[in-house]
């Protein structure tokens, strides 16, 4: 506020720079660039003296820690060693401005580090330490003075939070500054862009915009230089700053959706092929079972026929024996012969009757298939109780990079304990809706909304992160305050009520998340 009072009476006359060339199509993800812009600031210099105050100029910068700003050394050179020059930092959102002082100054590679006062808590940007390829799509974010002049902004407006200006282009590699390592690119810059970040399509910092080329007629041309990571990382390390780094390839949500659709189609084709294979295998197994059953039945019928014939032959022998005994007057022998005859005839009849019928072939084949099916079905657990199924599952969830888009978050394994009813880690109750179990997390200390999903059947855990502006974040916090969150392990009705209540927050979210992290969960060891 002191800075605003110092410069409000002043009018800053800015030169209107000629606009050269047409804008390239914005191929970067607007959501990621907007999210990164939350940590981009305007850096202003004001001199105070006996004759009053005057604004010396302004540039851009970006946060690498909540209270640490990177900018160009030439932006703050007038304040270096001069106690009469005040540095002010104005963020792109909110209503506050912050005093700053130089903590590291390196004119050799045009870098400076500022520390903010007044308990500043800006959104740090993430740096990309990987290789920058030729033709790579990029975005420059900052506060070009020609835009301020075209809008008619006065000095008071300059110390009021304003939206950043974003321009887009591509890397033109192969040429670097002789003084220090730089990235040559075509994203339009103007006076005032100095110190702002050069971003990739995921909103990660590739370099610090520094200067542009000048054509023969003195006008800005369409090639510009940004200080590369080879200069920035050692500079920050020497200053004791550990920035957040992310080196995964930059993929879009649309790319993930296409890959998921293709993967789903492949899975459906695989499932269909497996179903056909199982059907063919079952038909083959049934044919074999029927063939085996047919052989068994025919064999048993032949054995029964042979046994009946053998018994009939024996019965003829018994009849002959009984006849001879009667001719000889042997009553007892006759009775024995007749008894044997009766037994053998009955045995032959039973042997014939007990032969399996041909219709038994199909029945036996079905019985054999039932045995095969039963042997392929896993047995239930020993206790077989529902209590065992409802016991908490301790899982460890590992990121699947091929199905994830990670731009600014750290990659770590996630321990997760899931209980039936939607209780996570014994303290967080998930809501139940048509899309399954989920929880919307709206923190107070970070302008990020996370929507987490868990599929108990597939053991799949998904986190979608939305990097929000301060106004949208405040609206989401207001909606969160209206929700009565049930205790962990609540009834299904309460879980469904929570799922419905969270929908009010989801309506405030952008169409696509900035990050989508898919995890595969396995039992923890």
Feature locations, PLM:
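Flexible, gly/ser-rich surface segments that form the specificity/activation loops bordering the active-site cleft
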Residues: 75-79, 123-131, 136-181, 190, ...
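Catalytic-histidine neighborhood of serine endopeptidases
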Residues: 31-32, 58, 64-66, 70-108, ...
């Amino acid at each position: 506020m002191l800075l605003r009072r110092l410069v409000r009476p002043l009018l800053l006359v800015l030169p209107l720079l000629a606009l050269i060339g047409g804008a390239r199509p914005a191929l970067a993800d607007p959501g990621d660039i907007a999210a990164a812009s939350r940590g981009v600031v305007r850096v202003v210099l004001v001199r105070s003296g006996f004759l009053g105050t005057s604004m010396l100029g302004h540039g851009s910068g970006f946060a690498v820690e909540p209270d640490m700003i990177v900018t160009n050394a030439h932006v703050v050179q007038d304040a270096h060693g001069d106690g009469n020059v005040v540095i002010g930092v104005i963020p792109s959102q909110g209503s506050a401005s912050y005093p700053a002082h130089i903590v590291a100054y390196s004119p050799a590679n045009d870098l400076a580090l500022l520390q903010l006062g007044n308990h500043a808590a800006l959104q740090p940007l993430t740096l990309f330490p990987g290789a920058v390829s030729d033709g790579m799509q990029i975005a420059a974010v900052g506060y070009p003075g020609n835009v301020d002049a075209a809008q008619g902004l006065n000095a008071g407006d300059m110390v009021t939070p304003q939206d950043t200006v974003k321009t887009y282009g591509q890397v033109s590699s192969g040429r670097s500054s002789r003084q220090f390592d730089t990235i040559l690119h075509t994203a339009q810059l103007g006076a005032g862009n100095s110190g702002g970040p050069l971003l990739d399509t995921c909103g990660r910092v590739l370099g610090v915009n520094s200067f542009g080329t000048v054509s023969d007629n003195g006008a800005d041309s369409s090639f510009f230089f940004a200080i590369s990571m080879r200069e920035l990382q050692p500079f920050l390390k020497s200053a004791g700053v550990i920035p957040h780094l992310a080196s995964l390839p930059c993929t879009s949500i649309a790319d993930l959706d296409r890959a998921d659709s293709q993967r789903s189609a492949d899975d459906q084709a695989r499932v269909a092929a497996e179903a056909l294979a199982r059907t063919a295998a079952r038909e083959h197994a049934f044919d074999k079972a029927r063939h085996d059953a047919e052989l068994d039945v025919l064999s048993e019928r032949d054995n029964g026929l042979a046994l009946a014939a053998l018994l009939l032959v024996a019965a003829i022998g018994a009849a002959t024996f009984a006849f001879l005994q009667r001719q000889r007057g042997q009553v007892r022998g006759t009775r024995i012969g007749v008894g044997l005859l009766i037994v053998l005839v009955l045995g032959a009849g039973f042997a014939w009757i007990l032969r399996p019928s041909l219709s038994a072939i199909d029945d036996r084949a079905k019985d054999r298939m039932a045995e095969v099916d039963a042997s392929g079905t896993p047995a239930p657990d020993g206790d077989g109780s529902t209590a065992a199924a409802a016991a908490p599952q301790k899982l460890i969830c590992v990121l699947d990079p091929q199905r994830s888009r990670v731009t600014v978050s750290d990659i770590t394994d996630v321990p997760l304990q899931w209980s039936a009813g939607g209780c996570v880690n014994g303290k967080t109750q998930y809501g139940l809706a048509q899309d399954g179990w989920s929880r919307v997390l709206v923190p107070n200390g970070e302008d990020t909304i996370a929507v987490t999903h868990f599929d108990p059947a597939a053991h799949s855990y998904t986190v979608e992160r939305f990097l929000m502006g301060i106004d949208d974040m405040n609206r989401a916090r207001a909606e969160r305050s209206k929700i009565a969150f049930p205790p962990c392990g609540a009834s299904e009705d309460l879980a469904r009520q929570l799922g419905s209540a969270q929908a009010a927050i989801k309506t405030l979210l952008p169409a696509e998340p900035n990050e989508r992290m898919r995890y595969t969960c396995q039992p923890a060891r």
